[in-house]
Amino acid sequence: IDQGNLIPEEEESYNHTARVCAINKKDNKLYVSMGQPFNVAGPDKYPLYDQVGIGGMIRFNRFPGKLDREVVAIGIRNSVGHAFNPKDGSLWFTDNQVDGMGDETPPGELNKACSLSSKTWYGHPYYGGGNVRTNEYKDKKIPEKYAKNYCKPQVDMIAHAADLGMSFYSGKMFPKKYKNAIFSAQHGSWNAVKPRGARVMVTYLDKKGNAAKTEPFAEGWMTEDGVYLGRPVDVQTYIDGSL
C-alpha cells in the first residue's frame, strides 16, 4: 500500500496509527485497526476519520488487484487487539480509552462488533470509555447518526490498564471452562499515579456468545511498590495448549 492510501499523509502521526491485523476466515479479508492520533480530536476531524476508518477498523481483499478498502467500524479510540470468535465468527476487540480524566476513569473496553458496517459506532469521542462522557464532548448532543448505531462495550476494564492483544483459547491443556474464553493482555499504565495492569485477564462467554464474567488470570509482573517486572502485550495459544 503506497503512502497516503492507508492513512492520509496530512493525518500521519506517531500516535495510535495502524495497529493490528487479523484475517477473518469467514470472508478471507484482512482487518486492520486504525487508532486516533489524538487523545480526543476536535469535531472538525471526524468527517474524514469516519470516511477512511481512522479511529475505527477497515478491511481489505488479501489478493493483488484494486484496493478495496472498506470501513467496518467507527468511534474506536485506539484498539491494539482484535480477534474473531471461532464459534460464531464475531469480531471482538480491546480499546484503550481517554487519558487525563483521573486515575480511576474512564474504563478500558472489550468490545464485540454489533455489525461490520461503516455506520456502527463504538462511542468515541462522545464517550471516553464505558458510559463516561469525555470532558470535551460532555455538553454536546450525540449526533443521531451515531446514537442510533451505538454499540456498547461488552466489558468495562479498570481505567488506564492498557488492554492490548487478545485471543480466543483454542487449546486443550486448560480446564474445560477456558475453552473459547478470551484471554487479553493488560500492558500496564503509563501516567497513572498508582500503577495498574501488567496482567492477563480472562473473559468467559455465555451460550449466546456474549461476555459473562471477566477476572484476572495471571498476575505478578508488578511489585508492591508499583515497579514493573514485565508488561504483557499479547496472548496466543501455543500448539501444546499453553499460553
Go through each PLM region and give its residues.
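Beta-propeller domain segments
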Residues: 18, 36-66, 70, 76-78, ...
